[in-house]
């Protein structure tokens, strides 16, 4: 396990990031090497609507024919990425924005012809990330990747998980607008994949929290050791560098 931490910030959270979020990133930087991966779903949907293009999803993934990929690339690599980079720099954090196709950072395998230009991470060029970090920059990654010189859309959660796994990161942190998983009205601070599945089956975890914990479970399957779900509108870091929220680790199955 290394001293890298990957922070994944969904597109719906980008306009909700205030001083407290950037203060938390500064605190994390004191102990760890930080990489940020962002989404951009709401802005992509709005731009597609402006262009009279239907938003279509299949199994949670955006169906991405060529005309949609052009807009995804424009939003993720352009306005969304640069807005977050500028926000970090405004708070005196040195950041460099790049996409997964820059330097072949994220090399992908197409998911299926049916959903178009959508890929899954198969290789991460970690030397690029490490080089930026060694120059005291925070890499801010837009989740698009490359395959056979074509650009592909990547689900931001799986892009973050792929990067975290490739770096053998200490932790993957999902930034949300809730404190974490609640059980009987109390914050569930520590849990594992088996308990999460059990809580979903019992109906304890419902609604918008389900995709969040499913993303955490998928990350664990990709080799990430620890995933935390935190509230990015509050201080989510302890003095020790530990996260305040719900931390999910891999369970140990007993035969």
Swiss-Prot record:
Domain of life of the organism encoding this protein: Bacteria
HAMAP family, sorted: ArgB
Classification via NCBIfam families: argB
Residue positions binding substrate: 40-41, 62, 153
Pathway assignment: Amino-acid biosynthesis; L-arginine biosynthesis; N(2)-acetyl-L-ornithine from L-glutamate: step 2/4
Gene: argB
Name of this protein: Acetylglutamate kinase
Name of a matching Pfam family: AA_kinase
Keyword annotations from UniProtKB, A to Z: Amino-acid biosynthesis, Arginine biosynthesis, ATP-binding, Cytoplasm, Kinase, Nucleotide-binding, Transferase
Subcellular location: Cytoplasm
Residues forming coiled coils: none
Family per record: Belongs to the acetylglutamate kinase family. ArgB subfamily.
An annotated Gene Ontology molecular function: ATP binding
Organism listed in the record: Bacillus cereus (strain ATCC 10987 / NRS 248)
Primary location recorded for the protein, binned into one broad class: cytoplasm
Enzyme Commission code(s) on record: 2.7.2.8
Catalyses which reaction(s): N-acetyl-L-glutamate + ATP = N-acetyl-L-glutamyl 5-phosphate + ADP
GO BP terms: arginine biosynthetic process via ornithine; L-arginine biosynthetic process
